[in-house]
């Protein structure tokens, strides 16, 4: 009897090991600037600040045309380089808008985002958390130190209030917790983020001029203490002259153990 039980337990263990080995993983793709695509283990697609056709992406139009599926579009604030191609993608895919309440209202009333693809289930505010995609994804709203205005696509002089800027902490079931910081400077409350959830991956702006540069970004990484940091919002324009190398150097100075993984535009990694 004991031998039979041992065989049953061994079979169950092997089944679990095999299942884990073949389990789908999370894929993260960088399109340049602050634009990312997350594909969950079940195949759901999240786009963050999807300016796919940004100047750093030589294949922007091709990449934009190739997006045939998107379930959620997350927009951190109202500036043109973060709204990006979201309206065109939303109309093509039916993706629902995830944003702060004020930004969501501005985007649907003035920015052209389809009204029926935005609602109370996907709009929130700082301190709040959404559970979406049948529980596979949780999205917490994180403050940022920046600004946020919205302009109509056909009239960039008509400036509208976009609420407060922010970032997102995206927690994926059976996957990592990813913190997209949006456009921001360093702020001390970043140290509170990992008190509520361990951050595995931090997507951090390093370009300077409109956001923090590498040295201040390194201090932000120290406060959040992720396992991995991926630099963003640099090199799109000449004035965004922070570099991943400078970030790595600054992290070494403060003896951070966080691993820097610089991505090339269009590159994907599995997590």
What is each PLM-predicted segment?
Residues 150-223:
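Active-site-proximal loop/helix segments of hydrolase catalytic cores
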Residues 48-49, 70-78, 98-101, 178-182, ...:
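Active-site neighborhood of phospho(di)ester-bond hydrolases with catalytic His/Asp-centered motifs
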Residues 97, 108-132, 218, 222-271:
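Binuclear metal-ion centers of metallo-dependent hydrolases, dominated by the metallo-beta-lactamase
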Residues 70, 94-95, 199, 226:
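Local beta-strand N-terminus motif with an aromatic residue
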Residues 41-91, 105, 115-117, 147-162, ...:
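Pre-active-site segment of Zn-dependent metallo-hydrolases
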Residues 2-45, 52-54, 140-142, 265:
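Zn-dependent metallo-beta-lactamase
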Residues 54-55, 80-84, 104-107, 128-131, ...:
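Active-site environment of divalent metal-dependent phosphoester hydrolases
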Residues 23-26, 40-46, 129-140, 171-178, ...:
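Beta-strand-turn-beta hairpins that frame and shape the catalytic cleft
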């Amino acid at each position: 009897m004991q031998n039979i039980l041992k065989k049953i337990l061994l079979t169950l263990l092997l089944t679990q090991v095999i299942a884990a080995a073949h389990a789908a993983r999370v894929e993260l793709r960088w399109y340049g600037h602050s634009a990312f695509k997350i594909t969950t283990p079940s195949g759901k697609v999240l786009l963050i600040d999807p300016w796919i056709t940004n100047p750093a992406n030589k294949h922007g139009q091709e990449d934009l045309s190739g997006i045939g599926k998107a379930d959620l579009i997350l927009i951190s604030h109202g500036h043109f380089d973060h709204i990006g191609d979201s309206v065109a993608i939303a109309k093509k895919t039916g993706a629902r808008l995830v944003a702060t309440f004020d930004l969501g209202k501005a985007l649907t009333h003035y920015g052209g985002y389809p009204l029926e693809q935005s609602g109370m289930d996907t709009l929130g505010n700082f301190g709040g958390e959404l559970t979406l995609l049948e529980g596979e994804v949780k999205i917490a709203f994180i403050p940022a130190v920046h600004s946020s205005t919205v302009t109509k696509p056909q009239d960039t002089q008509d400036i509208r209030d976009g609420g407060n800027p922010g970032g997102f902490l995206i927690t994926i079931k059976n996957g990592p917790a990813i913190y997209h910081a949006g456009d921001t400077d360093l702020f001390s409350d970043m140290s509170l983020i990992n008190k509520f959830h361990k951050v595995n991956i931090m997507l951090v702006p390093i370009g300077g001029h409109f956001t923090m540069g590498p040295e201040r970004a390194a201090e932000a990484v120290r406060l959040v203490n992720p396992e991995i940091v991926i630099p963003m919002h640099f090199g799109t324009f000449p004035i965004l002259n922070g570099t991943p190398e400078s970030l790595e150097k600054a992290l070494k100075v403060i003896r951070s153990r966080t691993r820097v993984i610089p991505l090339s535009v269009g590159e994907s990694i599995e997590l």
